[in-house]
Structures are given as C-alpha cells and as structure tokens.
C-alpha cells in the first residue's frame, strides 16, 4: 500500500504503527516510527540509538477520567530529541449525541448505554479533553500548560 501512495502522491507521509512489531519491512512500509502509548523510556531508547526515522506517538495520554498524569515526561522529550515529533491525545473530543431528555425536556449529551443498547462501552466514549458540546474539560488546563497555550 505504501508503494501505491508514494506513486500517486510522492510527498505523502505514510504511517503504519505496527512496523515496530516486525522490522523486516521498516524501510519501505512507513515513513515514521510510531507507537501507541509507548512509555517515555521506550521513546527515549529509540531516539538514542541513531534512528533512521522520526518518532510520533500516534496515540498517547488517553484522558478517561483523570488520566493525563505523566504528560510532562513526554513533553520534556521534545526539547531533547530533534527526531521526536510528539503525539496525538486520544481522544480529543467526547463522542456523544445531543438529545432531548424525555423527563426534563432539556438538551443532554448521551452515549454508550444511555439508549439501552447492549453490549455497550458505557462511558468509554467520554474520554476526550473537550466535551461533545465543545466545552473544555478540566484536563484541557494541563494540555494548554504543557503545549504552551496558557493565557
């Protein structure tokens, strides 16, 4: 698939997270080293061994409940290693539907099991750093601080 995209669009960045599981194809399957939820030590180990490719955390800092602790450990790597490109927080936004509550008549956000659907992931869809209505969660304060967006 990488060959197809490179032929159609030579400037396209191709990412395949699974390449770290099988190094036989690393030279021609992905343009970056990428992992999900790799601990900072593993990221550092890769970056200190003369890497051929930049490193991107395709998922990190899952924000279910109060779980952005340890973000500083990843942010510190940005200033230490030129080939560390940071990562993507999972999820950015809660996944919910705005519906009218049948009892109060007010608009409410519902997700995972609120519609009597089974099986369900329950609140697992509510793991963003902003709510589904686009208002910020408390975790956004920490993200802004470490990303340098504080006002």
Where are these regions (language model features)?
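Active-site neighborhood of glycoside hydrolase catalytic domains
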Residues: 1-53, 80
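Substrate-binding clefts and catalytic carboxylate motifs of secreted carbohydrate-active enzymes
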Residues: 30, 42, 46-151
């Amino acid at each position: 698939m990488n060959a197809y995209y490179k032929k159609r669009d030579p400037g396209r960045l191709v990412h395949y997270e699974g390449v770290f599981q099988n190094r036989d194809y690393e030279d021609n399957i992905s343009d970056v080293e990428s992992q999900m939820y790799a601990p900072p030590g593993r990221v550092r180990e890769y970056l200190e061994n003369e890497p051929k490719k930049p490193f991107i955390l395709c998922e990190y800092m899952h924000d279910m409940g109060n779980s952005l602790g340890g973000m500083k450990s990843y942010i510190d790597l940005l200033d230490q290693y030129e080939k560390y490109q940071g990562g993507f927080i999972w999820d950015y936004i809660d996944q919910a539907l705005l519906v009218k509550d049948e009892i109060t008549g007010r608009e409410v956000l519902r997700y995972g099991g609120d519609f009597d659907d089974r099986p369900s992931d329950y609140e697992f869809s509510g793991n963003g750093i902003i709510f589904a209505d686009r208002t910020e969660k408390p975790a956004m304060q920490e993200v802004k601080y470490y990303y340098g967006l504080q006002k």
